[in-house]
Amino acid sequence: MPLRFTKLTVEKKQVMKESHYLTAQPANHDKKVIVGMSGGVDSSVSALILMQQGYQVEGLFMKNWDEDDGTEYCTAKDDLADAQAVSDKLGIKLHTANFASEYWDNVFEHFLAEYKAGRTPNPDILCNKEIKFKAFLEYAMALNADYIATGHYVRRGEKNGEPLLLKGLDGNKDQSYFLYAVGKDEIAKTLFPVGELEKTEVRRLAEEFGLITHNKKDSTGICFIGERRFKDFLEQYLPAQPGDIETLEGDKIARHHGLMYHTIGQRQGLGIGGLAKYSDDPWYVVEKDLERNVLIVTQGGQHESLFKTHLIADNFDWVAREKPTFPLTCKAKCRYRQSDQECTINELADGRVEVSFVEPQRAVTPGQSVVFYVDDVCLGGGIINVAFNK
């Protein structure tokens, strides 16, 4: 039986500071919102909140990977069942859409190309740009929606009439790093109901209203890999090229199965041990020599070779869709959940940018994204080409 709403109470935490950028989102019974229903607790509660706010709410489950390929990497069938159960509980219609073709063309092929080139990409960022905030948005607009909504822990703001992407108020769950490539026009058409909440509050609301997803484990990793070993998945698409593992001094100490299976700062899975010449301290990846197909390692997670003061990045996406004025002093993240790092951005003659950090950064990884902030505002970001010291 669909829920009958009385009053939805959301506890405001002391840590949830107010922002002068925030846009008010009054209830509007004439506005139709389609929520991206993933089968998780965040999108479930997003739909719940929007219904309480008076919107006309419908859901959409996106199939972005063909789980019928015989590998069963995805949990799409279970997720769809959960999304349907929540939709039934809320009394809303659930649409389904197959974006597997768009995902393959615009996300997965790029993912493979980056790994083949020896870099470590983040497909979730491209998925947000090309699928969740493009294909999904276009699909929803064709259904005469006024907005889409997602369960991302970010907020929508405004300054001088321009949409802004803000960090989520729960610092431990903020997902703005993954949404930096989404433009202002898409942000203006999107609602982020759980961006104002802490994760514990989201789960409390889901349990209070009897949603099946209230204790569902958060999804981790890449959808199309799921619980399988990354190496097992990748070798189905890219041929492995084994090579030597060397120390910084050039000693050959082991063999690797392929550079694409390793990333800067990696400790696990190197297969190095029992070397009489060296201590038992763990080994870490410090560099991938693509020309020689050699993995370079060192002992000690705080070794100076793991730290860089500068990086060069390209392929930028600015939320405002206009690049800022350089030089720009701001803060940056080189990986998800990293604390904001003070830096200065300078534009190079070839259009790339050089980022100079106040403090050396550990394990800066080519192929990953560097994302820039001023206070809570996400400016945008780009793809790391190379990291170095001056």
Curated annotation (Swiss-Prot):
Name this polypeptide is given: tRNA-specific 2-thiouridylase MnmA
EC nos: 2.8.1.13
Protein's UniProt keywords contain Nucleotide-binding: yes
Site (Interaction with tRNA) location in chain: 152, 368
Entry annotated with the keyword Disulfide bond: yes
Species name: Marinomonas sp. (strain MWYL1)
Family recorded in the similarity comment: Belongs to the MnmA/TRMU family.
Reaction catalysis annotation: S-sulfanyl-L-cysteinyl-[protein] + uridine(34) in tRNA + AH2 + ATP = 2-thiouridine(34) in tRNA + L-cysteinyl-[protein] + A + AMP + diphosphate + H(+)
Binding sites annotated in the UniProt record for ATP: 36-43, 62, 151
Interaction with tRNA: region residues: 173-175, 335-336
Function: Catalyzes the 2-thiolation of uridine at the wobble position (U34) of tRNA, leading to the formation of s(2)U34.
Active site feature: 127 (nucleophile), 223 (cysteine persulfide intermediate)
One Gene Ontology cellular component: cytoplasm
BP term (GO), one: tRNA wobble position uridine thiolation
Annotated region described as Interaction with target base in tRNA, given as residue ranges: 122-124
Subcellular location: Cytoplasm
Disulfide linkage: 127-223
Molecular function in Gene Ontology: ATP binding; tRNA binding; tRNA-uridine 2-sulfurtransferase activity
Enzyme class: transferase
Keywords per UniProt: ATP-binding, Cytoplasm, Disulfide bond, Nucleotide-binding, RNA-binding, Transferase, tRNA processing, tRNA-binding
Pfam families: tRNA_Me_trans, tRNA_Me_trans_C, tRNA_Me_trans_M
